[in-house]
């Protein structure tokens, strides 16, 4: 067999090994951590509901709770308060409200789906429609407006202009600011709050908040304790999936594929970090890890004949298909079917076994698109951009991962899965962002491997564009898609915030993973390694 393999020309990618080895198979966290959350309390919660507390003070507290990553403890109270405040129809043209306050309130309302108008920023523009130059002296106001502008939707030109103005202004004044404001501005310019992973942002803000002169010491301690408790829970789950991965032994059986189960868990944690989603995180991690194997089989190993057979086997979804498969992929196919059998048994207990049907159908669609992509590569075919994009929106895996992210979410019902299967506007926006950002980050590596059927190459040929022009266009596509996501998160919606937030959070993980045009999943050393250490290795000192 070795001689036969040597005669087969395979498109090997020679991926780097896992950074983590067996590090997370060893688990030293407290197994009772799940129960500690019942006893965690914050004594100053009364500030949220205290009679006579000013709206501005309450909104600032909500903002602080969210930035510190502890707002999930008070989710219902915060939703009720924001609804009450929104119903007040506050006149933000009143001079009593400064830019910092107005922009913060705007962002909080939009983050929670309330359709507040962007016209409230009009009073900070001159007769020519330009933002007042004097605002450059208001660093906090600029930062707040900068963060608010990322909640914009299509047609909100005032927020487009606000983003340009605040970005340039903050870059100009940042070197002259004092910390912690300087650190906060510098971080915001690299990682936008609305696009960031909530846990990463929480860890960063905890260190900033510690430097605030007016910090609430008890709230700070609570945030640190909560962060460490959640970290312990996440480490337990990472231990579970690492052990599962080790027992499958796919790293040894399929050495051509990326060994990234830790990075897969990082993605799942980004979709939902709260304690009640523990099962969902484990299930999603497993589906991402298995998809990664499939991706690499099509992209970096299988011959067209082997992939023809494997595609048919996935389509038929029957253990009997193993007889036809190449030897190397049989253990994986068996493990994949068994995984979904376990999911179905688990979900049947709560009357949700139908969810696995939608996940499997989405996986079949993904594999069909991988197959098309593989044939393009092998045939040296560069499709027109429209043809490329139609297929590539599926191979970015966002559609499949969005579907599987709801498997372990008890509140996700049949109507939610049916909605996703029809590719709604919000999902398509997510697909676009994932696709073009991935294409930008992986272009040079794929080009070096001889891949010509890439989005950048296709767009360049169809439009007579340079690489730089194509990349600029792809970023424009992503920015417009973010506007669509913001619009679809507005109330009213037939779908719960619980479901919508999974789509949004998965998009945030894309932004973090491909930060700086790097493929942080394939090469995690630079981009993801520091985050993984902060989230799953190093606790915060209390």
UniProtKB/Swiss-Prot annotation:
It catalyses: (2E,6E)-farnesyl diphosphate = germacrene A + diphosphate; (2E,6E)-farnesyl diphosphate = (1S,2S,4R)-beta-elemene + diphosphate. Its EC number is 4.2.3.-. GO terms for biological process: diterpenoid biosynthetic process; green leaf volatile biosynthetic process; sesquiterpene biosynthetic process. Pfam families: Terpene_synth, Terpene_synth_C. InterPro entries: Isoprenoid_synthase_dom_sf, Terpene_cyclase-like_1_C, Terpene_cyclase_plant_C1, Terpene_synth_N, Terpene_synth_N_sf, Terpene_synthase-like, Terpene_synthase_metal-bd, Terpenoid_cyclase/PrenylTrfase. Mg(2+) 2 binds at residues 295, 299. The keyword Manganese does not apply. Its cofactor is Mg(2+); Mn(2+). Coiled coil: none annotated. It is found in: Plastid, Chloroplast. Pathway: Secondary metabolite biosynthesis; terpenoid biosynthesis. GO terms for molecular function: beta-elemene synthase activity; germacrene-A synthase activity; lyase activity; magnesium ion binding; terpene synthase activity. Keywords: Chloroplast, Lyase, Magnesium, Metal-binding, Plastid. The keyword Oxidoreductase does not apply. A motif (DDXXD motif) lies at residues 295-299. Binds 3 Mg(2+) or Mn(2+) ions per subunit. GO terms for cellular component: chloroplast. Expressed at low levels in leaves. It is an enzyme of class 4 (lyase). Mg(2+) 1 binds at residues 295, 299. Mg(2+) 3 binds at residues 438, 446. Sesquiterpene synthase involved in the biosynthesis of volatile compounds widely used in aromatherapy and folk medicine, and present in culinary herbs. Mediates the conversion of (2E,6E)-farnesyl diphosphate (FPP) into germacrene A and beta-elemene. Not able to use (2E)-geranyl diphosphate (GPP) as substrate. Belongs to the terpene synthase family. Tpsa subfamily. The Asp-Asp-Xaa-Xaa-Asp/Glu (DDXXD/E) motif is important for the catalytic activity, presumably through binding to Mg(2+). This is Germacrene A synthase. It comes from Lavandula stoechas.
């Amino acid at each position: 067999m070795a001689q036969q393999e040597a005669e087969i020309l395979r498109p090997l990618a020679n991926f780097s090994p896992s950074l983590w080895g067996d590090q997370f198979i060893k688990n030293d966290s407290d197994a009772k951590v799940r129960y500690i959350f019942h006893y965690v309390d914050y004594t100053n919660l009364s500030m949220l509901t205290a009679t006579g507390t000013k709206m501005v003070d309450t909104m600032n507290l909500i903002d602080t709770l969210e930035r510190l990553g502890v707002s999930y403890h008070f989710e219902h109270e915060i939703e009720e308060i924001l609804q009450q405040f929104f119903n007040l129809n506050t006149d933000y043209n009143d001079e009593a409200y400064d830019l910092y306050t107005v922009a913060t309130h705007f962002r909080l309302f939009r983050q929670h789906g309330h359709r507040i108008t962007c016209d409230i920023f009009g009073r900070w523009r001159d007769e020519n429609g330009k933002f007042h130059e004097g605002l450059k002296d208001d660093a906090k106001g600029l930062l707040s407006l900068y963060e608010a502008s990322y909640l914009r939707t299509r047609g909100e030109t005032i927020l487009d202009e606000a983003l340009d103005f605040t970005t340039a202004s903050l870059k100009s004044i940042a070197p002259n600011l004092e910390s912690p404001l300087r650190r906060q501005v510098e971080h915001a310019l690299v990682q936008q709050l609305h696009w960031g992973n909530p846990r990463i942002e929480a860890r960063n803000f905890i260190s900033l908040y510690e430097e605030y002169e007016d910090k609430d010491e008890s709230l700070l301690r609570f945030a640190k304790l909560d962060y460490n408790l959640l970290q312990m829970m996440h480490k337990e789950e990472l231990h579970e999936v690492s052990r599962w991965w080790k027992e499958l032994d796919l790293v040894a059986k399929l050495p051509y594929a990326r060994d990234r189960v830790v990075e897969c868990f990082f993605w799942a944690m980004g979709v939902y970090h709260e304690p009640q989603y523990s099962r969902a995180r484990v299930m999603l991690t497993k589906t991402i890890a298995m998809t990664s194997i499939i991706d690499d089989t099509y992209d970096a190993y299988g011959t067209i004949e082997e992939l023809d057979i494997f595609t048919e086997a996935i389509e038929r979804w029957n253990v009997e298909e193993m007889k036809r498969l190449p030897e190397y992929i049989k253990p994986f196919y068996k493990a994949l079917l068994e995984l979904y059998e376990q999911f179905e048994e688990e979900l049947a207990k709560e009357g949700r076994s139908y969810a696995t049907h939608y996940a499997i159908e989405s996986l079949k669609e993904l594999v069909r698109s991988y197959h098309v992509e593989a044939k393009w590569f092998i045939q040296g075919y560069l499709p027109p951009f429209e043809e490329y994009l139609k297929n590539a929106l599926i191979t970015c895996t966002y559609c499949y991962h969005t579907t599987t992210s709801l498997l372990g979410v008890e509140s996700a019902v049949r109507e939610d899965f049916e909605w996703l299967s029809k590719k709604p506007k919000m999902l398509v926006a997510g697909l676009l962002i994932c696709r073009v950002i991935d294409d930008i980050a992986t272009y040079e590596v794929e080009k070096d491997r001889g891949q010509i059927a890439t989005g950048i190459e296709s767009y360049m040929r169809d439009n007579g564009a340079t690489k730089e022009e194509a990349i600029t266009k792809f970023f424009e596509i992503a920015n417009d898609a973010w506007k669509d996501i913001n619009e679809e998160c507005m109330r009213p919606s037939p779908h719960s915030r619980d479901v919508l937030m999974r789509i949004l959070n998965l998009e945030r993980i894309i932004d973090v993973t491909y930060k700086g045009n790097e493929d942080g999943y394939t090469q995690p050393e630079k981009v993801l390694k520091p985050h993984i250490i902060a989230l799953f290795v190093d606790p915060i000192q209390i």
